[in-house]
């Protein structure tokens, strides 16, 4: 069961609008490092006393809640370090869910290369033999579809898909 939803936000003036949205809608948030995404997560884990966490990125506003449930249920049943649906990817981009053991996440920080601090699960996937990772696989390979939204063009593309296709 998900106990808290927390939005991780950059310590950057451009993200003040997100903070205002969170305050207005009584959503918990945490502000952290702009330059080191991994450290932002560690700071949130420690300050908010988080044991495990589910990562869904901001460019994935159309995430399927059933996928979150599948990841959460698998993680809770077998005590994995990570349960994901991107290793290898079979779901569309923009439908990525990762549940990560907080202790393992913190312990791994000292071993990271610079590029692994930006993409927080890259280290685990690069060293997959050292970790218990389970991948949720889609019944149909949709890895070439992109449902993420990073630009206005993405938004209009997704809008068109939603109007014409069952997802």
Question: What does each model-identified segment do?
Answer:
Residues 1-12:
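Short beta-strand/loop segment that forms part of the nucleotide-sugar
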Residues 16, 63-146, 153-156, 160:
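Conserved core of the sugar-phosphate nucleotidyltransferase
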Residues 7, 29-31, 135:
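A structural preference for short, hydrophobic beta-strand core positions in alpha/beta folds
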Residues 11-76:
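Short phosphate-binding loop-to-helix
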Residues 1, 22, 124-125:
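Hydrophobic C-terminal alpha-helix "anchor/cap" residues
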Residues 160-167:
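Left-handed beta-helix
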